[in-house]
């Protein structure tokens, strides 16, 4: 099995690990991200099988131009992995800057919609696969995760709705919903506080970027008559939080 896969957010974490896994398996990989220097480093590592394009997926015009400029050998995209996303801050809603909420919505939702919409004709032609990186936060709320969880719930429902809209086209759509994962994502969430980021995972043995890359490859490797609607995974040391109870004095 081989083909062409486009991965958003390929400059670190899940995206970078997925790029490495698919190149190893003989695929051509298009990696997107904002940090051109990281894409260049990944291209130097992975060779001609990797094509990096630096642009902002929240910008519709930039997205259209970047996809239109793809080299001929990378145009027939078989898999889209919507991985780009972020969480900003750990504070409860009254203490959050509105711009952080807007940034999460723009990146996690608007950017995903831009690139998915532009690639749908190709994915239909190729009878391809759309993999959306959601989160267990789509199901289970946690303190400080209000808007982030809301964006991931959108992704999950969008995945199910997109599959319904593409019924009969041979396109598969999967929502992957990880629990605690240790990547650069958490360092962004904590505003660059390495100690706070490390403490979140202390003693947890969290999911790794390679675990998610292997999961995405497994989804893509299923027979064409099977669609994985959603896939929820957690570290063994993470389970479901109990309800909060406020007790009046």
UniProtKB/Swiss-Prot annotation:
Alphabetical keyword list: NADP, Oxidoreductase
Molecular function per GO: serine 3-dehydrogenase activity
SMART domains documented for this protein: PKS_KR
Highest taxon above the source species: Bacteria
Substrates-to-products reaction catalysed: L-serine + NADP(+) = aminoacetaldehyde + CO2 + NADPH
Entry binding sites for NADP(+): 6-30
Class of enzymatic activity (EC top level): oxidoreductase
Active site residues of this protein: 148
Any one Pfam family match given in the protein's UniProt record, by short name: adh_short
SUPFAM superfamilies with a match to the protein in the record: NAD(P)-binding Rossmann-fold domains
Residues bound to substrate: 135
EC assignment: 1.1.1.276
Glycosyltransferase as UniProt keyword: no
Function statement: Catalyzes the oxidation of the hydroxyl group of serine to form 2-aminomalonate semialdehyde which is spontaneously converted into 2-aminoacetaldehyde and CO(2). Also acts on D-serine, L-glycerate, D-glycerate and 2-methyl-DL-serine. Does not act on O-methyl-DL-serine and L-threonine.
Family of the protein in this entry: Belongs to the short-chain dehydrogenases/reductases (SDR) family.
Subunit structure of this chain's protein: Homotetramer.
PANTHER family: ALCOHOL DEHYDROGENASE
Designated name of the protein: Serine 3-dehydrogenase
Organism: Agrobacterium fabrum (strain C58 / ATCC 33970)
